[in-house]
Amino acid sequence: MPEQLQKLVIDNGSYTIKAGFNTGDDDGNDTSTPIKVTNAISKTKDGIIHVGNQYLSHTNNFSGIQFRRPFEQNNLTSWETEKPIWDYTLDNLLLQTNDQSQSTSSSSSSSLQKHKRGKVIDPDDIHLILTEQPYQLPQLSTNTDQIIFEEYGFNKYYRCIAPSLVPFSVDTNQINDDFVLVIDSGFNSTWIVPMIYQQIHWPAVKKLPIGGNLLNGLLREMISFRHYDISEDPILINTIKESTCFISSSNYQQDLQHKHDLMCEFVLPDFKLTITGFVKNENSMSSQKLPNDTQVLKLYDERFTVPETYFHPEIIFDNNRTTASSSLLNNAPFKNLTDLIVESIMACPSITQPLLSANICLSGGSTNIPNFKTRLIGELRKELPSNWKVNIFDKQYDINRDELSWYGGINLSNESELLQEISISKKDYFEHGANWCQQQFGFKNV
């Protein structure tokens, strides 16, 4: 008998939460789409606290905004911060009008006792699929389990790492979903996760501690030192990165020698003409009418030096006055993204190695940097055997790369029998205790 519970998928990323219900019907029609919520509590200069996306309606206060995130060192460490964000997310999921979607709930149960498509939702009617970071500390995972069952009271629950859901969202006409090497680069770090028959091969999982957050920090230091002090404008820094940065497609040193040819101008926000800033373009109408006092930022090698850290991590220390002169760091053998991918493939069973190199899938928002795929293919072909195919797939049914795990969760929720086998019910949790989830979901037992 098919499960009657509603399926809710929450991809709990350290930068944004992707959440949504499986709205598919028995005829195979699926209109499921996630909502995206900033996974942070923010404070503007006027002292007002905003939860999730609330700060977006106060664009005049973007300058000097401060973000507090529940993640530290890739681990979900603060449910005191996370829970209000979840309540806000659930309100936005379950409320229909704009006025309702802006409110935050004072308690988890009140967040869930709302209406969705005219139906009353109860936490006991929800089967939750939740993602977490790889190798999260067991006690922190246990804290999450307690929140799920004891605070919210969901009926059933499956917890997994986000990259493990990617094979469920790939285009099987392009990729052999039995052997997928997932490169998941997000806000805090980059993970290399080999999936063999939809199972994680844990001995080969690798981590590169470089992600969007580090790139933002490096860009902030370079611009503040060379041009203007933008250290208190995290939104501006992120906008500049997403608008101007790219990875050298083949030769970083050559681009460095011709950096003046790659210069671009970024118009800084004046909160009159622009709130977030934009790239100055001769064909842009806004650029032709710039006031005389407009501040324009000229960017040269900053555009490609910052994301080059994926392939030359030593750049991080070269641009720091304290560490640049350290002989220990200068002689340290830093491993880049290519090195870790090769190590991951070689740590898998030999028969699967060429299959994994031929089925590489990019996920995570940081892989959207221009030329990421092109450069990575070129670097891998230099390191892997010449008779191996190296294929990287980044377009899966026109799904955004940062949404691949969420859509994978939706597809997994359609596999009712499989989901039943790997999930834990609220009844099981209270019968066996808090450690039961860790025994079922923990990486040591997979």
From Swiss-Prot:
Q: Which InterPro entries does the record associate with it?
A: Actin, ATPase_NBD
GO BP, sorted A to Z: chromatin organization
Q: Name one GO molecular function term.
A: nucleosome binding
Mainly resides where? cytoplasm
Tell me where on the tree of life, at the top rank, the source sits: Eukaryota
List all Low complexity biased stretches. 99-112
Compartment(s) = Cytoplasm; Cytoplasm, Cytoskeleton; Nucleus
UniProt-annotated stretches for the region Disordered: 99-118
Q: Which CDD domains match?
A: ASKHA_NBD_Arp6 (cd10210)
Identify the Pfam families for this entry: Actin (PF00022)
Give the stretches traversing the membrane. none
Q: Name one GO cellular component term.
A: cytoplasm
Alphabetical UniProt keywords: Activator, Chromatin regulator, Cytoplasm, Cytoskeleton, Nucleus, Transcription, Transcription regulation
Assembly mode: Component of the SWR1 chromatin remodeling complex.
Q: Tell me the function of this protein.
A: Component of the SWR1 complex which mediates the ATP-dependent exchange of histone H2A for the H2A variant HZT1 leading to transcriptional regulation of selected genes by chromatin remodeling. Involved in chromosome stability.
Q: Which family does the record assign?
A: Belongs to the actin family. ARP6 subfamily.
Protein name listed in UniProt:
Actin-like protein ARP6
Q: Which organism is it from?
A: Candida albicans (strain SC5314 / ATCC MYA-2876)
| Source taxonomy | Eukaryota, Fungi, Dikarya, Ascomycota, Saccharomycotina
